[in-house]
Amino acid sequence: MVRSVWKGPFVEGSLLKKADVARSSGRHDVIKIWSRRSTILPQFVGLVFGVYNGQKHVPVSVNEEMVGHKFGEFSPTRTFHGHSGDKKAKKA
């Protein structure tokens, strides 16, 4: 279900503060965040965020195509090792 337009996008307050500090200082360090549910805003374009996936912070550099999506979409939490193959097909 899509979020109501009148509510606006959800962004963690601390995330906005961290992004403003990074923009004003001009430093291009990775901004560590734990808020995977926050929406990517246009003012985040060009910044690099370290999005926590449960084990480590995955670096995500934000571009214009990511605006409107959530940070969690770009930091997978599960590793897929593939389905087990058919052993009969491998031998033949």
Swiss-Prot record:
Pfam families cross-referenced by the UniProt entry:
Ribosomal_S19
- Which InterPro entries did the record assign? Ribosomal_uS19, Ribosomal_uS19_bac-type, Ribosomal_uS19_CS, Ribosomal_uS19_SF
Q: Organism's domain of life?
A: Bacteria
List UniProt keywords, sorted A-Z: Ribonucleoprotein, Ribosomal protein, RNA-binding, rRNA-binding
Gene Ontology MF annotations: rRNA binding; structural constituent of ribosome
Does the record carry Cytoplasm as a key word? no
* Gene Ontology biological process: ribosomal small subunit assembly; translation
Mind telling me which GO cellular component terms the entry cites?
Answer: cytoplasm; small ribosomal subunit
Q: Supply the HAMAP family for this chain.
A: Ribosomal_uS19
**Family of this protein:** Belongs to the universal ribosomal protein uS19 family.
Give a short account of what the protein does: Protein S19 forms a complex with S13 that binds strongly to the 16S ribosomal RNA.
Protein name (record)? Small ribosomal subunit protein uS19
Which source organism does the UniProt entry give? Rhodopseudomonas palustris (strain BisB18)
Q: What is the lineage of its organism?
A: Bacteria, Pseudomonadati, Pseudomonadota, Alphaproteobacteria, Hyphomicrobiales
Gene giving rise to this polypeptide = rpsS
